[in-house]
Design a protein with these regions (language model features):
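Long, low-complexity, mixed-charge
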Residues: 1-49
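Generic structural signal of hydrophobic/aromatic residues within well-ordered alpha-helices
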Residues: 13, 274-277, 290
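Conserved beta-strand/loop scaffold segments within soluble protein domains that form the structured core
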Residues: 32-253, 257-260, 281, 287-298
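Extended amphipathic alpha-helical segments enriched in small hydrophobics
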Residues: 252-276
Length: 298
């Protein structure tokens, strides 16, 4: 068994904060290579390990001006490492929807990468209703006029670990990134979100924003929010914000006035971020998977 470092920040911060990277136990020598699957159009992939440790690669290509949507659903109870490489051409759009529906005790390592040429766009949606641990590392580079929209929803329960790292390089002019991460933590769940917006020299006219909302439902949960904006260009605009806290008394009163006790109110709010994102996607299969997992996978 090896200890590997994953989800590294592009620029290190104070070591005492414990957020520069994450140490993860992984059997590198025993990892089974599941090969590479290439998609050049819309598709749905059901991905599972089939072995105690497995690695798979997915390449998604979109021709110039094309729009491609791919759904990746991760299942099973083992350790799964999936590398998803996005290859949009000029003015193409790739929409990637990932759903973690793995069992408790399972571990998902998801790596998404893209070099987005002129005028292209990536839409990344990640829904985490499953009970497995998730380590996600996303790295994208935007050329002139390219854009990223990223939205993530999660529910951390029991001793679950959710460790997210998203780094977007604004390399070209007039690029745009919008990042929204929302979720809830209950039991003794732990979550880290590192969001980096990196304005490179030559990215004039670019904008980037990241927003996070975290609902804390217990005294034993651990949340770490790490927004990072790097700037080597003057004419850019970068913003970040976070709303973190428990249910306030006004919200509880609202629910109680409609017949819900505290436990029921917390349950409804805990599910809200993932359910809302699934609803907004408008995909029946995704919504069914999310509801199945939120209802206990039974």
């Amino acid at each position: 068994m090896d200890t590997i470092l994953v989800n590294k920040l592009p620029t290190r911060t104070w070591n005492r904060l414990g957020v520069n990277e994450t140490a993860l136990l992984w059997d590198e020598a025993g990892t089974v290579d599941g090969g590479t699957e290439v998609l050049t159009g819309d598709g749905r992939l059901e991905l599972s390990a089939g072995a105690p440790y497995a690695r798979k690669t997915v390449e998604i290509a979109a021709a110039a001006g094309q729009r491609v949507t791919v759904y990746e659903t991760f299942r099973g109870g083992e350790h799964l490492h999936v590398r998803t490489v996005l290859r949009p051409e000029k003015d193409a759009v790739i929409r990637l929807v990932q759903v973690q529906a793995m069992d408790g005790g399972a571990v998902l390592r998801s790596e998404v990468s893209a070099r987005c040429p002129e005028g292209s766009a990536v839409e990344l949606y990640r829904l985490l209703p499953g009970r497995g641990d998730t380590y996600a590392d996303d790295r994208l580079t935007l050329a002139d006029g390219a854009s990223l929209k990223a939205a993530m929803g999660y529910l951390g329960r029991d001793a679950q670990v959710i460790d997210l790292n998203l780094a977007v390089e604004h390399a070209g002019r007039d690029t745009r990134s919008d990042i929204d991460v929302s979720g809830a933590l209950a039991g003794s769940a732990k979550k880290v979100f590192r969001g980096t917006i990196d304005f490179k020299h030559g990215s004039a006219g670019s904008t980037g924003s990241e927003q996070e909302t975290v609902l804390l439902l217990g005294d034993d949960v651990v949340n770490k929010t790490v927004p990072l904006i790097l700037c080597a260009e003057e004419n850019v605009e970068g913003t970040h914000g976070a709303t973190i806290g428990a249910l306030d008394e006004d919200t509880l009163f609202y629910f109680e006035s409609r017949g819900f006790d505290r436990a029921a109110a917390e349950s409804l709010m805990a599910r809200a971020a993932v359910e809302r994102l699934a609803h907004d996607l408008g995909d029946k299969a995704t919504a069914e998977t999310v509801l199945h997992e939120l209802n206990g996978g039974v």
